[in-house]
Amino acid sequence: MSNSAVAKRYAQALFELAQQKNILAEVGADLNELTKIVQESPDFLTLLNAPKFSIERKKQMVAEIFAGATPEVLHTVQLLVEKKRVNEVKLIANAYAELAAKAQGTADATVFSTRALSAEESANISTTFAKLVGKQSLNITNEIDPSLLGGIRVQIGNHIYDSSVANKLERLKRELIG
C-alpha cells in the first residue's frame, strides 16, 4: 500500500475520533506543532527510527515530548512508532488538515498581488471567492508578484482566477493578433 494511502487512513481515523469528541481544532493544532518539530529537527525522526532504542522506550520518549498534546495525537504518534510508520507524520497532518477544512467549510487560497493586501481586502476576497467555490470561508495567504502589473490572481486548490492587468493585456494581445 502506498504511503499516501496509509497516511490518509491514519488521518481519516484521527479525524473521525476528533470529530466525535468535538476537538478538530485542538488535534489540528497539535498535528501542526508536530509537523513543525519534524521539519525543524529532522533528528527527531532519526531518533524515533533508531534501532538502538526499544519501541517501548521510543513510545515513552514521545509521551514525554508531547505531554501537552491531546491524547488522540499522542496515541496516534505512539502507534506510528509501534508500526514503524513515523515517517508518515507530515502526510498524515496534511491529510487531516484537508479533512478538517472540508468539514468546517473552509479552503486554503493563495492570492497573488503586486502589493501586500490589507486585512479588509483579504476579508473581502475571502468572502467573495468563498461564495464562488461553495465554502464558508477561505484561509488567505498573500504572495507578492510584481509581474502582475495590477489586479490579483487567486488560486484555490487546482483553480486559478486571474484578474491581473498582465492577463488582461495578454488576452487583448491574442484578440488583436488573431
Swiss-Prot record:
Cite the Pfam families for this sequence. Answer: OSCP
- InterPro entries the UniProt entry points to: ATP_synth_OSCP/delta_N_sf, ATPase_OSCP/d_CS, ATPase_OSCP/dsu
Q: Does the record's keyword annotation contain Cell membrane?
A: yes
Question: A GO CC term?
Answer: proton-transporting ATP synthase complex
Membrane topology per the entry is: Peripheral membrane protein
Gene3D superfamilies under this entry?
Answer: N-terminal domain of the delta subunit of the F1F0-ATP synthase (1.10.520.20)
Where on the tree of life does the source sit, at the highest rank? Bacteria
UniProt keyword annotations, A-Z: ATP synthesis, Cell membrane, CF(1), Hydrogen ion transport, Ion transport, Membrane, Transport
Q: Name one GO molecular function term.
A: proton-transporting ATP synthase activity, rotational mechanism
Residues of the signal peptide: none
Please state where this protein is localized. Cell membrane
Q: What does this gene product do?
A: F(1)F(0) ATP synthase produces ATP from ADP in the presence of a proton or sodium gradient. F-type ATPases consist of two structural domains, F(1) containing the extramembraneous catalytic core and F(0) containing the membrane proton channel, linked together by a central stalk and a peripheral stalk. During catalysis, ATP synthesis in the catalytic domain of F(1) is coupled via a rotary mechanism of the central stalk subunits to proton translocation. This protein is part of the stalk that links CF(0) to CF(1). It either transmits conformational changes from CF(0) to CF(1) or is implicated in proton conduction.
Instruction: Tell me the HAMAP family matching this sequence.
Output: ATP_synth_delta_bact
UniProt protein name: ATP synthase subunit delta
| Gene from which this protein is expressed | atpH
